[in-house]
Structure formats: C-alpha cells, structure tokens
C-alpha cells in the first residue's frame, strides 16, 4: 500500500492539474451533500456530536446541513470542517432488499457528513486525473469499454496479416467480495500518508480515518424491538446475530465496529486505492512478459470494487502466450493478497467473448445493459 501510494502520489503531482484540483476542492461547497436523502440527527447513543434520544431520528439532509451552515456562517466544506473540533463516526442502519440478499445501508450523522464530503470530494478530484477510474467518467465508460474492444480486434487482425504474429484478447472481469469489511483504517492511513498531500489536508483526512476505525452504529428499530421482547437466555438461530447481540451495548443497542470503510462511505477513496494497486499490477505483468518475449497491451476500468481489464497479448509462440495467462492471473491474485483484497473466484472470470463492467455487457461495438 505504501509503494502504491508513493507511485500514485508521484503520478498525480506530475499532472499539470494537480494544484488546480486541490484549490478547486478546497473551495467546494456543501450543496452536493445536501442531495443525500437523510442524515442521523438524534440517536440512542452518548456522543458529543449528536443529541440523545430514546429513539433514533433521521432527518432530511438539506435541513440538518442548513442548520450547520447557519451555526458556522459558511457553506464552504473546508470552512465547516475547520470549525468542528471533534469527528465522530456515528450511524444508523437499515437493511436494503436486493438480489442475493439484503445489504446493510448506513446513514451518516449530519456532522460527519460534512467531513466525509470534504474527504470524498478531494479523492474525487484525484480520481478524475486517473484514466482507469470510472466513478468520475460518467457515461464515457460505455464508450471506453466498447471502443477498446474494437481497437484491440483491429490490431489483432493487423498483427496476423502484416506482422505474422498471433494474438489473444482475454479480459479479467472481477467484482471483489467482502471489499468494505476487508480494509482496515491503518492500511488506508499508510496509503494516504504515502500520497504526499499537503500536511493540513493530510491531517484532516487521517482524522476522518481514525474516526472510522471506531464506528458507532445504532441498530435497526425492528431488531431492537425483537430483543426487547426476547429473553436474554434465548439463543438466536444465526450465529452471527447471536454474536452481535452479545457484543452490543445492550442498554443503547449500539454496536462499535473497529474496521471496514462502511458500505459505500469512502467510495472514491477506495477507488483511488484500487487504481493505485492496479498500476503496480500492470508494471509487474509488463516486466514479467517482456522476459518471455510476449507483448501485452492493457486497458483497465475500475469503480471502487469493480474491475474490467481488457488485454491484447501478442507473440510468435502460442504455448507461451497461453502460459502467460496463468501467470497473469497468479500475479493478479498475489497483488490482491498484498492489498488485503479478497479474490472471489465465483465472481471473477477470464473471458474471451464478453466483457462486463457495472452490468454493461459488450462484445465489440455490440452491448446491452443487464
């Protein structure tokens, strides 16, 4: 992570827009955070940033942040966070139904929202400078996916007819499993420090990560009511739920989580880490295949935990080219391990026919949404 952060920092600072991006994000306002549906305003937990209430209260984000703006007299994100002396990562939770089982959704406290907005806005600016990062590319990503496939196909034909070289067009399609829970704030901190950001920005970002290393989560009301009406001697059918019950502040129904970024919270920061890790992967693959007299071109698309790496592998020995595919997957898995990324091979494929990224399936210029 430190190597990836160092290389990423050097690459970003070499970009002529680096200082302009920092200035732009430091002068950003809080208005975009107001578009979020709701924020936690009161909770059944003892904190210094939220009012205590016997029942949690979620309020519309634009109303809670309006109060914060009136309190501090500024709508500048940097101005708001500089006037807060304490960052507490407090959340409420509710389950969201989806295919494959419900996903937990965390609602940030309204004061935390301004700090996360500052951090994520900065990371968004850095992501925009990296060609692999797709959260910031909008509707351009579909064109990148299709045009890359067509370009590689044309080059494959050219290599065969003009250079008498054989070529393969594989693609790694991956959706990481246990992405959010796997990361620790210590690991994030190493990466952040290695980026070499100005000390004032770095200090605040580290404070946000420190707060996230001890998140306070108010459990859903339905679960609270269930345990209120259930004897403490009665064991839960699911082992994970029983563990949660035993390790929760039972009088407040608050659980303290010591790791993980929080589902969808540090979205752009995790995407920045992923592209930095992938840059290291590309360097290792290119150096290794050069020793085997195999040429490779790669175009990678990344959005947080999703990845599509389209490749054009060319050479004169077909056996060496197929063997290199096994080596590429091995290097991919090892770099994932070194970055604490769990590779779920049920959701990872080496494809020769179809490419998929964010539910957009394509083969050449033909494509469809799932």
What are these regions (language model features)?
Residues 1-370:
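Viral RNA-dependent RNA polymerase
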